[in-house]
Amino acid sequence: MHQMNTKMHFRFALALLMAFFSHDVLAKNLKYRIYEEQRVGSVIARLSEDVADVLLKLPNPSAVRFRAMPRGNSPLLVVNENTGEISIGAKIDREQLCQKNLNCSIEFDVLTLPTEHLQLFHIEVDVLDINDNSPQFSRPVIPIEISESAAVGTRIPLDSAFDPDVGENSLHTYSLSANDYFNIEVRTRTDGAKYAELIVVKELDRELKASYELQLTASDMGVPQRSGSSILKISISDSNDNSPAFEQPSYTIQLLENSPVGTLLLDLNATDPDEGANGRIVYSFSSHVSPKIIETFKIDSEKGHLTLFKPVDYEITKSYEIDVQAQDLGPNSIPAHCKIIIKVVDVNDNKPEISINLMSPGKEEVSYVFEGDPIDTFVAIVRVQDKDSGLNGEIICKLHGHGHFKLQKTYENNYLILTNATLDREKRSEYSLTVIAEDKGTPSLSSVRHFTVQINDINDNPPRFQRSRYEFVISENNSPGAYITTVTATDPDLGENGHVTYTILESFVLGSSITTYVTIDPSNGAIYALRIFDHEEVSQITFVVEARDGGSQKQLSSNTTVVLTIIDENDNVPVVIGPAMHNNTAEISIPKGAESGFHVTRIRVVDRDSGANAEFSCSIVSGNEENIFIMDPRSCDIHTNVSMESIPSAEWALSVIIQDKGSPPLHTKVLLRCMVFDYAESVTSTAMTSVSRASLDVSMIIIISLGAICAVLLVIMVLFATRCNREKKDTRSYNCRVAESTYQHHPKRPSRQIHKGDITLVPTINGTLPIRSHHRSSPSSSPTLERGQMGSRQSHNSHQSLNSLVTISSNHVPENFSLELTHATPAVEVSQLLSMLHQGQYQPRPSFRGNKYSRSYRYALQDMDKFSLKDSGRGDSEAGDSDYDLGRDSPIDRLLGEGFSDLFLTDGRIPAAMRLCTEECRVLGHSDQCWMPPLPSPSSDYRSNMFIPGEEFPAQPQQQHSHQGLDDDSQPAENGEKKKSFSTFGKDSPSDEDSGDSSTSSLLSEMSSVFQRLLPASLDTFSECNEGDRSNSLERRKGPAQGKTGGYPQGVAAWAASTHFQNPTSSSGTPLGTHSSVQPSSKWLPAMEEIPENYEEDDFDNVLNHLSDGKHELMDASELVAEINKLLQDVRQS
């Protein structure tokens, strides 16, 4: 039993490979065997393993999928598309599937996907029988009647048992229970069925035993063996004299399968010698005849005619075996038996059958193929068969319809329909194909099958515009949202592949996005305006419209260019731009001597429209009744028609209309007031009549004049702003931190007195201030001047011009006094100015520039931007950013060009006047006592007000008029030498009183205020523009001696003196100034020229000692005054 179960669940997988190669399609037969009644889901085969040799030849074997092409019984087996596993999908019953056929199989086809590399596998699964059925009789009791006179050996056919199994599992034999009178013999019919015949083996005697009951058993040979039984109930009757007899015990008949119903097959004839009822014979089928025979054939009980009651089919049943009996009507009648064998003859009565297997999820008669698929793409599987045999069953298959498809045979009567060309759905979307199958019988029979191939769309066509460029026009002054036009693109693809969406690609028109000008409806391509168009602003708009389809895999697009021309409308009136108009009125001057044809003026007109809308004509509509003037309508030139000398009138009011040629026309009306005036010299008629001579237009003169006035006003505003900024700084709170920085605010003037110490001598050589080395590292490195070196310097620099800069403090300029040195300034004697000062004809006014105790004498470049009225636009002040441009002719440019950049730098040292600041200054601000030094009383010795470079500010001197103060101020120097001062000018200061010193000191004190009044105060605020010199100057400010604070005094006086005495040159050797011819004639210069170039502030005593060694004479006051007058004259000349 266990072996039986094992055999039932055994999967017999024998693959018989039959490969047919045709082009690129491989057909391969695979056969498997399974037993019926296996569990659902049992795996039969794995195609991925069984056809691995074929799959390895494909480009991508791992991506291959399997698709089963179903037939009628296909639901019994299923195929996994990914793995190719064939498994049982439903219960398989061989007896139900194939009945008694010995060969039972399930056939279907499997394709590989994708179809570009199609492989076809034909699968045949043979279903093997298991012994799951027992033989059965149709009747549990079989009655049999036998005459007691029946001879030994008499045969009586018995009912057959039925076993649906086949082979060894089917009915094999019969057996009869043990007895002495009867036996059985097993016989086989022509169809292979087995039946038993009952044989009388011993004479019967009804008087001994009238009936018998025997068991008839039918058995198979299956494992386990199965059997079925029935009871034979035999009755023994009295004997009858004669029984009917057939002419033959058996008959064989040939029956054409196409024989019609009612055909007489056999006329049975049985004879009985008896008479009367005993001689009348009745014909009938034997009791054990199968129901199928009774349904197919019919026998006439009286005549014995066997006829066809139902059509037979050779393909279903090839033969029939019929048992017929004849029995008389007498009592105890014994029937006679006859066997009739009917063989069905095959004829060509079956047309070929065509089955088309399409890979269609829906309709059975429609196959779908994607356009663009390569040649030999799978379309359908065709299977043809003919139930006839021989030539009647041989079939010829053909494909009709279109040359784009072909029929390719794979095995037996199976075919493939493949594409024979690349298909294009846009050219043809559907094909009707016809399969014709014809057998070789006579006459030949054929079948026809139609099906449809529909081409699936792919997104292989981009949207296409009718034109690559569209040009449209629209009038200006349109309303926003106005419809412009529609651009349409067509896409022959289907569905989303053909759904077109329109967009405008991003571009810019006059700096604005195109989407602010026009928009497009994405569904239909309608273009609308988004704004009011102005032809004068933009006359043409060009943009690109993109049409894109909605393909899912990829989207295709195409572009077209749209040119939108904006048509001009006459919406602008002519505008007169010349001559200059005021309230549409212009004044025209005409010389008295103007002859006929004199060009009075030309009206210049501008019309922003274009074309005819911009064309205009001019005409005089009134004021010219006497035809004194003529006007060219095209050029709008006005000429005199008569001589002005002959016209008594001196003024005309001409009304002129300028009208364009638009529709409707627009015009402008102006009034020209023409006035006649006399020239000092009459204009010649030739010059008047010459139209070609260019004359300066009045309007151009006005424009130039306005420009010049604006420029002058701008300069005045800049100067005014500079002065205001400086005065505003005076109101700010003072801060010691700021005072220590590079820029110091101008404090309030502490004193109105004039100090002779306001004159400071600053020696220069060749127009260049002494420059300290940038790389001085220690005080010891400071150069010193030896007398021996001075002599060599004097000979080497014989052509150098040593100038003395006299810096005069501007503390004492009176409020009502202002003097600027120009070329037009008349000569002013110093003695006159001194006399005015002493006589009190003017009063000094306060100056906010401070005195020598409160000023640092330098203005830092980094603070000069505070006075600037310009902004770089970058948020920060930059080098060179000031109110004066380097290219302009300003005093600061001349000063820079002459080498005085160092005068405007500061060293950041705290002046002595600021040492009174306390910690409260940092918190509460500074008071006047903080920044105002104690003022000295007027001293006869100028040294008390003298600033010597390199020296610290002296302490507050006591007010005295004796010359002892001069001696007190003069302290020994570090070298042990006596301090030299300006009074000595090369000589030692005497210890006794000197009237000459007193007069000289008084004179210098008064000259201080004179120079302050002679020079412009605004020049004191100029700053450098060279950022590089700033850092250089800061390096040079470091003093060589400990505890000393020095710096170069600077100011406008230094600039004036420099301008007078120097003639600087540029790097190219070209003089920078305009006074190169002025040669200084001062008696000071021979002595000052001996000062070396490397002069330092701390070497001032050495200079004086050197000068004293030269034994220079001291000039008196009158000479000094004359020299100063000479200085003033040279300054004015330069």
From Swiss-Prot:
InterPro entries, alphabetized: Cadherin-like_dom, Cadherin-like_sf, Cadherin_CS, Cadherin_N, Protocadherin/Cadherin-CA
Question: Where in or outside the cell is it found?
Answer: Cell membrane
List the PROSITE patterns. Answer: CADHERIN_1, CADHERIN_2
Can you quote a single GO CC term? plasma membrane
Alphabetically, which GO biological process terms does the record hold?
brain development; calcium-dependent cell-cell adhesion via plasma membrane cell adhesion molecules; homophilic cell adhesion via plasma membrane adhesion molecules
Ranges of Polar residues composition bias in the record = 791-800, 1059-1082
Residues bearing glycans: N103, N269, N559
Q: What is the residue range of the signal peptide feature? A: 1-27
Q: Which UniProt keywords apply?
A: Calcium, Cell adhesion, Cell membrane, Glycoprotein, Membrane, Repeat, Signal, Transmembrane, Transmembrane helix
- Single GO term (MF): calcium ion binding
The annotated topology with respect to the bilayer is: Single-pass type I membrane protein
List all topological domains (Extracellular).
Answer: 28-699
Domain named Cadherin is located at 28-137, 138-246, 247-354, 361-465, 466-576, 582-688
Region annotation Disordered: where it falls in the sequence: 769-800, 868-888, 941-1004, 1022-1083
Residues crossing the lipid bilayer are 700-720
Q: What is its main location?
A: membrane
Expression sites (tissue/organ): Predominantly expressed in kidney and lung.
Taken from the record's topology, the Cytoplasmic segments are: 721-1134
Comp. bias intervals (Basic and acidic residues)? 868-877, 1027-1038
Segments carrying the region annotation (Interaction with DAB1) are 892-1134
Q: How does it assemble?
A: Interacts with DAB1.
General function of this protein: Potential calcium-dependent cell-adhesion protein.
Name this polypeptide is given? Protocadherin 18
Name the source organism.
Mus musculus
